[in-house]
């Protein structure tokens, strides 16, 4: 019997690292962003992590259906609102990186 066909998963992952000048004010901004981003139909997942070794450092990990969906989100009102709300709350610009997922597979 032949093995079932493999289906390639197109997945775009993005990380955004924020170093807070005002952690108490930044955390609610990022938490709201996570909630709103999870409502986007093309968002596979988004997590907010707080560093254990660097207090005030936060990491957003996002997974998107496609590169186009990720780019569209970065131009969205949700992203713009979050970026504007971060003014004065960071010790420097966020570190944003785009990742390839060579080991990605769909759990559905």
PLM regions and their residue ranges:
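Short, surface-exposed ligand-recognition loops at beta-strand->loop->(often short) alpha-helix junctions
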Residues: 17-27
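An amphipathic, aromatic/His-enriched active-site/gating alpha helix that lines ligand/cofactor pockets
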Residues: 5, 28, 32-44, 65-97
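Glycine-rich beta-strand-turn "strand-cap" elements at beta-sheet edges
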Residues: 1-9, 48-56, 82-108
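Short flexible/disordered coil segments
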Residues: 14-16, 76-77, 102-108
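Residue-level signal for secondary-structure boundary sites
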Residues: 22-24, 68, 104
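Short, well-ordered beta-strand segments in beta-rich or mixed alpha/beta enzyme
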Residues: 10-17, 47-74
């Amino acid at each position: 019997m032949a093995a079932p066909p493999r289906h390639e998963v197109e997945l775009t992952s993005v990380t955004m690292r924020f170093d807070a000048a005002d952690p108490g004010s930044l955390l609610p901004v990022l938490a709201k962003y996570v909630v709103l981003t999870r409502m986007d139909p093309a968002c596979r997942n988004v997590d907010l992590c707080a560093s254990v070794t660097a207090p005030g450092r936060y990491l957003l990990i996002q997974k998107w259906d496609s590169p186009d969906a990720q780019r569209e989100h970065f131009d969205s009102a949700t992203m713009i609102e979050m970026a504007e709300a971060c003014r004065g709350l960071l010790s420097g610009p966020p570190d944003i990186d785009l990742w390839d997922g060579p080991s990605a597979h769909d759990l559905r």
